[in-house]
From Swiss-Prot:
Cytoplasm listed as a keyword: yes
Binding sites annotated in the UniProt record for substrate: 18, 41, 76-77
Organism encoding this protein: Pectobacterium atrosepticum (strain SCRI 1043 / ATCC BAA-672)
Name assigned to this protein: L-rhamnose mutarotase
UniProt keyword annotations, A-Z: Carbohydrate metabolism, Cytoplasm, Isomerase, Rhamnose metabolism
Role this protein plays: Involved in the anomeric conversion of L-rhamnose.
EC number: 5.1.3.32
Protein transport is among the record's keywords: no
Any one cellular-component term (Gene Ontology): cytoplasm
Amino acid sequence: MLRKAFVMSVFPDSHDEYQRRHNPIWPELAEVLKNHGAHHYSIFLDKQRNLLFGYVEVESEARWEAIAQTDVCQRWWKHMGDVMPSNPDNSPISDALDPVFYLD
């Protein structure tokens, strides 16, 4: 299992809306994530800095990357575009984090 962590941001006035849209996420999105080998997916909000920290365990990098090509993911990105900075393809602006420490 590969561990991935990343940081995104959310607009300062959109914290509550971001959380509302994730609780619960669309069932079809949860299904796509699981079917593509995503496990233990969490997102944490740092309200003071408007940062989102994501963590997910994936079965393979290729399967994780394939999620972006699904219709439901494309629709989700559009749905979230008004609450967070996005790339021209509507994907959230995201930076991978380097692992520093792990205790099993």
